[in-house]
Amino acid sequence: MQQLKLNNGVEIPILGYGVYTITDDKECERCVINAIETGYNHIDTAAIYMNEPAVGRAIKNCGKRREDLFITSKLWVQDQGYDMAKKAIDESLKRLGVDYLDLYLIHEPMGDIYGQWRAMEEAYRQGKIRAIGVSNMYADRLCDFLYHVDIKPVINQVRTNPYFQHIDTFEFEKENNICLLYTSPSP
């Protein structure tokens, strides 16, 4: 599958399989294994989806080596600040049964996102996360964010479709070498 090189050198598959609405554990595990068998190697989950354990079992049982998969998860808003974010990162790793995540995102830019980001930068430096980014952050907020962090986000995952094009955000990201990751293409 074709890949894109992020601003830190990590390569991400251009297509990913998201498990947002798959809440039944057995169904989630089966769907992820089926997705991997059909050629997806990027699996996108999040703490709030409450299916990280099922995704972890699928990773373990899919027959592929961990390094051949690209796993994304996200930090939810209840994990405000540095300490809560550090704990949440470790809990996601444990639930998924992996030693590292390929990509970890702030799911919603609310509350103490700077404390969350510091914890993510630390986990990145420790090798627990290969790439860090944000989600649902639009141009004005992203511009301010870049002035207050040490490591620039590699990705901004934003709901995008013909009705929500976010041209200003796309242009800002292009100028700042931040990849726009589209999600939820339906209106």
PLM region spans:
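Conserved small/polar residues in nucleotide/adenosyl-binding loops
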Residues: 182-187
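Short glycine-centered, acidic/aromatic-flanked micro-motifs in structured strand/loop junctions
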Residues: 19, 45, 73-75, 106-108, ...
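N-terminal, well-ordered alpha-helical segments
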Residues: 33, 53-57, 73, 87-90, ...
